[in-house]
Amino acid sequence: MIFTLGINHHSAPLAIRERVAFGADKLPHALADLTRERPVREVAILSTCNRTEIYCSAESPDVVIDWLAHYHQVGREEIAPYIYTHDQPEAIRHAFRVASGLDSMVIGEPQILGQMKDAVRAAEENGTLGTQLHKLFQRSFSVAKEVRSTTAIGANIVSMAAAGVHLAERIFESIAGQRILFIGAGEMIELCAAHFCAGKPKQVTIANRTLERGRALAEQYGGTAIRLDELGEHLAQHDIVVSCTASPLPIIGLGMVERAIKTRRHRPIFMVDLAVPRDIEEEVGELDDVFLYTVDDLAQVVESGLESRQAAVVEAEDIIANRVKDFLGWLESRDTVPVIRSLRDSAERMRRHEIEHAMKLLAKGEAPEKVLEHLSHRLTNKFLHAPTQTLNSAEGGERADLQGAAARLFHLHAAD
């Protein structure tokens, strides 16, 4: 049975989501820990700014919920009210919707597809991706491609990066003339840098754990790079701060920002924290001269382009409904695999035995035509012995059922 369980921006606030997030470097250990000594056969973990989801093949989701709470050292009762669980067929539909961007904060955004592929790659590399989940995700990627190529779901999207620019322009008349500090150098920061730098800021600085990666991004926009441990020295020089790292703990604290505000003589700082868990301490937003926005704060802005895409959403849901039916058909066909494998193994044993017998006859000088005739008769009798015996011994309704099954299995047609 395929299950999906998780917490996302629909079900839980940021304060809860950040407590159960998984950094990319933690996934190998988490995957191994979940499948160790637990009745979980397959598992993949998708963890982004807006969701932490566990896709698994298991008997029940309860053991996974217990593990999630234990792994993150939180009480089950603290997170249980925010957790949603889906079994078949809803788990399949949910995976297809997530991959297609229908469950995202920004409806139709394409980044989630890459994030899901990363989650699948991590599961595959760590040996927790089996036949069912592999097929589920490959179908999810195929459905996402179909949705994007046949509907307008990706049109008129207001991205998180564009929303950040929109909010900044409420504080400052324009981006031009402002000094911007980007913290991190991942995909989200790259997107934000492209949007903000289109406004021709006065200065661009990239702060990153590895200076080389920071420099590579900074050079694209004529900026400079600094290390994360230099943030305290440089924060006061910037008017706009956009942060998105994978740090498990905040990297900008209240004290650091208070000192920066004092140095700036209370000129405002606009800050966007796109990280989960948060990069900037929540208390920073209470300072008078700081305008701090999180991923949840940007939700209303990114919804602005959704109305024009409602027709595309309906079309996408129809596509997904049909593909869910197809996948359920594949799952049902998997139920017959053990029987088919056993049937073929039995036939193969018979074949090998009769081939050995025939080879011995040929070695004794028997005529090949006679040996082939003998071989074909013996194979026919062996293959049909068990079903014939079962049909002959059946009675009443069982016999009628078996006769019908035999006719279907062997494509038999009754004589006129």
UniProtKB/Swiss-Prot annotation:
The record marks H94 as: Important for activity. Gene3D superfamilies: Glutamyl-tRNA reductase, N-terminal domain, NAD(P)-binding Rossmann-like Domain. CDD domains: NAD_bind_Glutamyl_tRNA_reduct. Pathway: Porphyrin-containing compound metabolism; protoporphyrin-IX biosynthesis; 5-aminolevulinate from L-glutamyl-tRNA(Glu): step 1/2. Pfam families: GlutR_dimer, GlutR_N, Shikimate_DH. Substrate binds at T48, C49, N50, R51, S104, E109, P110, Q111, Q115. Transmembrane segments: none annotated. GO terms for molecular function: glutamyl-tRNA reductase activity; NADP binding. Homodimer. During catalysis, the active site Cys acts as a nucleophile attacking the alpha-carbonyl group of tRNA-bound glutamate with the formation of a thioester intermediate between enzyme and glutamate, and the concomitant release of tRNA(Glu). The thioester intermediate is finally reduced by direct hydride transfer from NADPH, to form the product GSA. HAMAP family: Glu_tRNA_reductase (MF_00087). This is Glutamyl-tRNA reductase. It comes from Dechloromonas aromatica (strain RCB).
